[in-house]
Amino acid sequence: MAQDPTRAGSEPPDWAGEVMQLSQSEITALATKAARGAGLSWGEAEEAGWACGWLARAGLPAPAMLLRGLDAESSASPLRAGIRLMDHAGLPEGPCALPVTLQDVAEPLVLVPFLARVAERMGAPVDLDLGSHTICLTGREPVPDLSALRGICHRTGARATISVSQSSRAAAPGRFDGRIERGVWQSLDALALLTTVPASEVSRQRAGAQSSDND
């Protein structure tokens, strides 16, 4: 039976080399479980999985970017920052009423899917200014091609400024990149395995007590 690369704790698949190709749904599932294993709530983990799939659609090395985002300290986490910005989008005190600057962000391109959702909810394009590059997100389909930005992945300690954009020019559509390196897959799979830890003796006893009460 073929190995399922999204199943937590699965044996490494039959790699033809150091890189394997996953589908968008496989990337999303693996990323969601890994994010949960890394300590995010299930709701946050689902958002992280969605963002990872979005980044892959934009032509970026999404699994590796997610892994670095999960490794970041909480204060530098692009996942937590992106989720906060997205949750507050559209409110009177929303994040883009005035420019917002985030300091010391790890893997800042992970913010991009969340800012696309911010733009969608606000009904206005949003700029992400990273100093050397400015990315305009309209929130409309298709997902833009960001493959030219692969060279600025791995950044740490970045300064990111988010503001309402003065431009609504749509970028060319992205081309899906489902490649994942063996080491990245193994690290994400190890995190995903943490979601399948057996129940503790205390939790089993509690479950038994609840069953007895219902007899």
Predicted regions and their residues:
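Long alpha-helical, hydrophobic tracts
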Residues: 1-82
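Proteins with a high burden of low-complexity, intrinsically disordered sequence enriched in S/T/G/P/A and R
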Residues: 3-20, 44-45, 130, 148-156, ...
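Glycine-centered secondary-structure boundary/capping sites
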Residues: 18-21, 39, 59, 90, ...
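Short, structured coil/loop segments at alpha-helix boundaries
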Residues: 41-42, 107-109, 177, 181
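A glycine-rich, acidic short-motif signal
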Residues: 63-145
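Extended, charged low-complexity segments
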Residues: 148-215
